[in-house]
UniProtKB/Swiss-Prot annotation:
Membrane topology note: Peripheral membrane protein
Signal sequence coordinates: 1-25
Lineage top rank: taxon: Bacteria
Encoding gene per record: algE
Classification lineage: Bacteria, Pseudomonadati, Pseudomonadota, Gammaproteobacteria, Pseudomonadales
One GO BP annotation of this record: alginic acid biosynthetic process
Annotated GO CC locations: cell outer membrane
This protein's name: Alginate production protein AlgE
């Protein structure tokens, strides 16, 4: 198996970060290392809703993740690799699933995921001596960036990130840009990630015990270029550029902390999106897509996410949530909200340790021209078991605009025109999810690795969703689609 230059560089940099620093090179008993073993079974039928061939996945995957961590004084370093072997193209990683479950057809294999591959997930060095507070760290390298709700950031990316985390104040500030996937099978970045720089900052304060308010900001600068009129456009070319800024307000009762025992938990956020977007216009000429020009416009959009959760007793909780990302604005879609591009939309909103997709394990919507109403119930028995049952209902905000990315990849016939959705129809569908986990053993991992490793040392988990398409997908599509996973994880 040939390693691409970025993977080689990642491996080399990982060893350099861990061993070339004088304070780390002398570590012996203080270093930590281990191996995460994950076996994933996946069943999916079918993301195309019967509108084209393919779209099914049935198989088993083995995911090995060796890691090493060390610290001495104010310095720390961490690296995690990955080796995957599977019988099909299995999603063993919830952080980098394709939104629609598809691979990019480029005419080569630069964005074609293989059943088996090697990767570098993380490699970073950290320094905690800028202030006297124990929850402060400056970290440089490929690392996990994560917001509690998963709707702003939850990904592995190259970044310079400063975190400040104390009892009464939390803040982070950083800059990030993706340079490679660091995988042997994916040698090209996705077009939307090329030449895109992220600058972000958050601050939140605990204004009364157990209740937080905060401000969030995120800016993306896309320095990529679009094809000129008459040039052929392939699947790896950028189709949009622009500068976008997100500003948000949030308030919550520490609702994403599954250990909190409040009788009533809540979360609420509102986000404004402003900036400018350039979109490439194309037309089909023979077998090629040819650029015809670009459409430029200002962006003025907003989104909100609201939720409440009631604890009935120490084991049972019930709740409801509503989210809306604006849509519309005419031909240029100036009112269409979009997320930052670093989100996973996974969080502990049901009140259990298991992180659940906010917009359905099957549908996997993005908060753009989308509104979602959610009801859920959850159960937790000590640290041994948890379960969540979730119902979602999805609509378009504007029936004439497309939604953001999702886990559905259908092409519908709308009066002889192939579209993603039927023009004018808002009903996207509904979904039922179930997530059940059995935990076997608490892990003995360094506290500073809590962002990189979420779980205890052993578990078995079922994640399953059944989606029923609505009128927006037309009358010729399948009545149901499902996506289900069984994960077995053991950490040595």
């Amino acid at each position: 198996m040939t390693l691409n230059p970025f993977v080689k560089a990642g491996i080399g940099l990982s060893f350099a970060l861990l061993w070339s620093c004088p304070t780390l090179a002398e570590m012996t008993a203080e270093k930590n290392f281990g191996l995460d073993v994950k076996i994933t079974g996946q069943s999916e039928d079918d993301r195309d809703l019967g509108t084209r061939s393919g779209g099914d996945v049935n198989g088993l995957g083995l995911d090995l993740r060796p890691w090493v961590y060390g610290e001495r004084g104010n310095w720390s370093a961490y690296a995690m690799g990955q080796a995957v072997a599977a019988t099909d193209t299995i999603e063993t990683d919830t952080l980098r699933q394709n939104d629609d479950g598809t691979s990019t057809d480029t005419g080569d294999d630069s964005r074609q995921p293989d059943k088996s591959y090697l990767a570098m997930r993380e490699f970073w060095v950290g320094y905690s001596g800028l202030t006297a507070y124990p929850g402060e760290q400056l970290r440089f390298g490929r690392q996990r960036l994560r917001s509690d709700d998963g709707m702003w950031r939850d990904t592995n990316i190259e970044a310079l990130n400063w975190t400040f985390d104390t009892t009464l104040l939390k803040a982070d500030l950083g800059v990030a840009q993706r340079f490679s996937e660091y995988r042997t099978d994916l040698t090209e970045l996705a077009p939307e990630d090329k030449d895109r720089t992220h600058i972000y900052g958050n601050v939140a304060t605990q204004w009364t015990p157990g209740h937080w308010v905060g401000l969030r900001a995120h800016h993306t600068h896309d320095s990529g270029s679009l094809k000129n009129p008459g040039e052929t456009v392939d699947a790896l070319d950028k189709t949009r550029t622009g500068d976008l800024t997100w500003l948000g307000l949030e308030a919550n009762s520490d609702a994403y902390n599954w250990r909190n025992d409040h009788t009533v938990n809540y979360w609420g956020s509102v986000t404004w999106l402003t900036g400018d977007r350039d979109k490439l216009s194309t037309q089909q000429v023979g077998d090629d897509q040819v650029a015809t020009g670009k459409q430029s416009g200002d962006v003025n959009a907003w989104a909100t996410d609201l939720g409440i959760r009631l604890r009935l007793d120490p084991q049972w909780q019930v709740g409801a949530a509503y989210a809306r990302g604006s849509g519309g604005g005419g031909d240029d879609g100036s009112n269409n909200f979009e997320q930052t591009g670093l989100e996973s939309n996974r969080s502990n909103f049901t009140g259990t340790r298991s992180r659940v997709h906010r917009f359905g394990e099957a549908f996997r919507g993005e908060l753009g021209n989308l509104q979602a109403a959610t009801l859920f119930a959850s159960w937790q028995l000590r640290d041994d078991y948890d379960a969540s049952l979730i119902y979602h209902k999805f609509w378009r905000v504007d029936g004439n605009q497309n939604i953001g990315s999702s886990g559905i990849n259908a092409v519908v016939d709308d009066n002889g025109v192939n579209r993603q959705l039927v023009d004018g129809e808002k009903d996207l569908g509904q979904e039922m999810d179930v997530v059940v986990t059995k935990y076997f053993k608490q892990g003995l991992l360094p506290a500073s690795m809590s962002q990189a490793i979420d779980e205890p040392s052993a578990l078995v988990r079922l994640r399953a969703g059944v989606f029923k398409p609505g009128d927006a997908y037309g009358k010729e599509t399948d009545s149901y689609m499902h996506r289900a996973f069984v994960d077995v994880i053991w950490r040595f």
